[in-house]
């Protein structure tokens, strides 16, 4: 970043290897540290690539690749995404207009991991989503959109199914989620940042169904994360 003349402090940069939940867990960390006055702005991003021989062999051995051997596998992908998170004061001083507000975030740890014999009832995902939506009035503050890393693996889908049973009252339609892995494959550690991009662009381009979006991710190591975004929907002249 110094070579590109970006105002980023290399000495304060940190790298985390937390899988799919990396970015949203860093949102949670940044939100808390910024509230404590430690930082005014954080650049948070995720980079992922499954396209290495050892990684592909590992996925194939565990029957996680979508194909004739496993119909409940996923399509691997690679990508990157970054988000600039700032306090309202810092954004105002920089002359920037935020395109979304991080209303709340939460993390939890699942002990019943994928590729084990233990039954997973979505306890950690339920915990993280419940904590994220805790400040909403379910009767009027509905969540309009859901972006998640459901990727075709039954384990992931079942987690959200149990969450729907517990927290359906907060959503317009808890089963009407957007799972971008259907289109671009599983983006792994880049997922959270890319979901932010999808949610904010839907609002900016006028096709979002409302201003509130829940983002959630699930890592193989048990980390579960959720974030509630609010972005004003700009009416589109091309949509009635």
Positions of PLM-derived features:
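Short glycine/threonine-rich loop-to-helix capping motif typified by GTGT followed
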Residues: 114-118, 151-166, 187-191, 227
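Acidic, glycine-rich active-site loops and adjacent beta-strand->loop/helix elements
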Residues: 20-21, 47-51, 106-110, 150-151, ...
């Amino acid at each position: 970043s110094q070579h590109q003349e970006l105002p980023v402090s290399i000495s304060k940069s940190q790298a985390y290897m937390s899988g799919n939940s990396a970015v949203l867990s860093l949102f949670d960390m940044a939100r808390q540290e910024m509230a404590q006055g430690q930082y005014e702005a954080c650049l948070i991003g995720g980079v992922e690539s499954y396209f290495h021989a050892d990684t592909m062999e590992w996925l194939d051995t565990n029957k996680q690749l979508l194909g004739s051997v496993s119909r409940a596998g996923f399509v691997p992908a690679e990508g990157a995404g970054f988000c600039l998170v700032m306090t309202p004061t810092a954004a105002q001083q920089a002359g920037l207009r935020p395109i979304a507000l991080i209303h709340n975030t939460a993390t939890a740890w699942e002990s019943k991991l994928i590729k084990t014999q233990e039954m997973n009832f979505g306890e950690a995902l339920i915990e993280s989503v419940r904590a994220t939506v805790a400040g909403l009035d379910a009767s009027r503050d509905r969540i309009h959109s859901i972006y998640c890393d459901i990727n075709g693996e039954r384990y992931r889908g079942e987690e959200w199914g149990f969450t729907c049973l517990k927290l359906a009252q907060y959503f317009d339609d808890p089963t009407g989620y957007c799972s971008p892995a259907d289109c671009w494959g599983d983006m792994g550690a880049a997922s959270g940042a890319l979901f932010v991009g999808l949610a904010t662009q839907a609002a900016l381009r006028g096709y979002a169904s409302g201003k509130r979006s829940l983002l959630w991710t699930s890592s193989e190591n048990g980390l579960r994360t959720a974030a509630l975004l609010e972005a004003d929907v700009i009416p589109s002249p091309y949509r009635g």
